[in-house]
C-alpha cells in the first residue's frame, strides 16, 4: 500500500497554500495571507512591511520580486517560512485541524511555474529534464503538522488526567 500524497494545494487542500485567505500576525503586523507575511519579511526596513498588510497574495508576490532583499535572506528564508507557517496554523484553529486531518499524507507543493525550491514543478520541461523539486514548503507543512499532532496528543492526555 502506497503512502497518500497531496500534490496540489488547491480545492479542498487550498488551506495548505500560502495564498489561502486567512489572517497571519507576525512581528506585530497582521497580513491577509501567509504569502503576504512571507513577502513582507524580505524587506530590509521593518516599517516597509506594513505595506503588505492589505494586499492580495498575488500583489504581495509581485512586490516581493521587485524589492531589495534584506541581508542574509538566502540563509534565513527557510526559517522565516517555518515561522510564517507556524503563525498561520497556530492563529487559525480550523486550519490547524484541517492540517492535522491530512494524517500522514505526504504534502507536495505541486506547481507548473518552475518552483523547485518551495515545491515540485510538474511542467513538461521539468519532467523531461528529470528535475526533482526540494519541496521545502511541503516539508515545513509536514513538520508543523507533526508539532500540532504532538500538542493535541499532549492536551488529550492532560484532559484525561
PLM-predicted stretches and their roles:
Residues 1-161:
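Charged, low-complexity intrinsically disordered segments
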